[in-house]
């Protein structure tokens, strides 16, 4: 974080860790927010501001009954808690890790839970796979007052049944991104492509990928997102430490800088800083 990229703040996104060991099952994820809040509070004033915003986890399938969980999460971090991530990635292939039941976004219970989230002024981080983008668009239209932050350029897949089919896969992904971009309450995060399911070989190389090559690989993907959503609804994400299996923090941020060189200083400020400050309500 202090390696020359002028990182001013970070956002903590849940990783299903440090849960409460007992108590009601639905309340156990509160332990993760309690852990992070305690960690950050004990550090005192620091620069950059670590975990200036915290995204926890709650099961939206609880429907209206998720509200006490959200209240507990907010109480655990009154100044930093901003919302939750409920990953809904599902695919019929056994090669793809399923994180939710099929069609979770379309269930009334999940939507009722999401309405509780919106009513309390919190945001929803959403991680899914690209064949679900149309379902997410329908969900976003049904709850227009909920800000939805889509993770990792919309869940591109290039493994299992999606391997060696780039023309078809990229075509369907582009269509899904274009459809989702019509929902004004949706924001896109640009990153997370170092994970194995994105089908690149960077993690298997004997020599690490450099920022110039990485920028070349990322540019067409991220430019499509920016073209569809606009500069004001996109933001770069490191997805660290998860993505460090494929490249270093320095390399990925240098790649972001390279691929964004054609944008104005104001546009780059939006992509690297301003949009995140707005979406996550990060103070000065």
Predicted regions and their residues:
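Catalytic pocket-lining loop regions of alpha/beta-barrel enzymes
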Residues: 100-235, 246, 264
């Amino acid at each position: 974080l202090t390696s020359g990229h002028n990182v001013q703040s970070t956002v903590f996104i849940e990783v299903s860790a440090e849960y409460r060991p007992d108590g009601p099952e639905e309340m156990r994820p509160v332990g993760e927010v309690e852990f992070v809040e305690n960690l950050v509070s004990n550090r005192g004033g620091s620069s950059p501001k670590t975990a200036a915003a915290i995204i926890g986890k709650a099961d939206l399938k609880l429907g209206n009954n998720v509200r006490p969980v959200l209240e507990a999460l907010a109480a655990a971090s009154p100044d930093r808690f901003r919302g939750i991530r409920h990953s809904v990635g599902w695919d019929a292939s056994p090669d793809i890790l399923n994180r939710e039941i099929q069609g979770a976004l379309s269930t009334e219970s999940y939507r009722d839970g999401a309405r509780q989230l919106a009513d309390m002024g919190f945001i929803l981080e959403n991680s899914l796979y690209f064949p679900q983008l149309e379902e997410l668009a329908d969900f976003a239209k049904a709850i227009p007052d909920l800000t939805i932050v889509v993770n990792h350029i919309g869940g591109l897949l290039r493994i299992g049944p999606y391997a060696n089919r780039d023309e078809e896969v990229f075509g369907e992904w582009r269509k899904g991104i274009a459809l989702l971009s019509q929902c004004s309450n949706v924001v896109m995060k640009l990153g997370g492509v170092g994970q194995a399911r994105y089908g690149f070989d960077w993690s298997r190389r004997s020599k690490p990928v450099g920022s110039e090559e990485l920028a070349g690989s990322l540019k067409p993907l991220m430019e499509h997102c920016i073209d569809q959503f606009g500069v004001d609804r996109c933001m770069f994400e490191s997805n660290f430490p998860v993505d460090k299996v494929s490249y270093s923090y320095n390399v990925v941020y240098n790649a972001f800088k390279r691929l964004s060189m054609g944008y104005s200083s104001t546009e780059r400020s939006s992509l690297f800083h301003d949009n995140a400050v707005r979406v996550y309500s990060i103070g000065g």
